[in-house]
Amino acid sequence: MPRRGNIERRPIPPDARYNSVLVQKFINKVMERGKKSLAERIVYQALDLAAERLKKPQMEIFEQALRNASPSIEVRPKRVGGATYQVPVEVKSDRRYSLAMRWLLMSARARTGKPMVERLAAELIDAYNNTGTTIKRKEDVHRMAEANRAFAHYGRL
């Protein structure tokens, strides 16, 4: 870690279609091997497909799916006197959305037998409806934090 102050974060420009930084970040996460136009096509078509199936605006579906999938609390390992405790801590908003996007994408990639557009659309719909693998992952993280609630006081040292 550098000792000379904080690192300045590069601002991510919003995407062209929805003028949203969140959508742009999601496109960047979907992108593989620098193929951004392909990633954009996948994300936009998946959002269109989800909107068509749910009969709701694309951005509403995307934002609600992200909100539903984002964890509010997680566990972090903390070493105290030779023992490592899983300490529950609150998740910062940047990391919250980043985890939600990562989990959505992992769940979509884990589904098989269909094109990525359909898998991603299905995962977005599931997250929007508070079901599916992504939501299960979030609930597992919350359950883990709840189970280790006794060690929460270590987080405030």
Swiss-Prot record:
Keywords: Ribonucleoprotein, Ribosomal protein, RNA-binding, rRNA-binding, tRNA-binding. GO terms for molecular function: mRNA binding; rRNA binding; structural constituent of ribosome; tRNA binding. The keyword Chaperone does not apply. Pfam families: Ribosomal_S7. One of its GO terms (biological process) is ribosomal small subunit assembly. Coiled coil: none annotated. PROSITE patterns: RIBOSOMAL_S7 (PS00052). Gene3D superfamilies: Ribosomal protein S7 domain. Belongs to the universal ribosomal protein uS7 family. One of the primary rRNA binding proteins, it binds directly to 16S rRNA where it nucleates assembly of the head domain of the 30S subunit. Is located at the subunit interface close to the decoding center, probably blocks exit of the E-site tRNA. Part of the 30S ribosomal subunit. Contacts proteins S9 and S11. This is Small ribosomal subunit protein uS7. It comes from Chloroflexus aurantiacus (strain ATCC 29366 / DSM 635 / J-10-fl). The lineage of its organism: Bacteria, Bacillati, Chloroflexota, Chloroflexia, Chloroflexales.
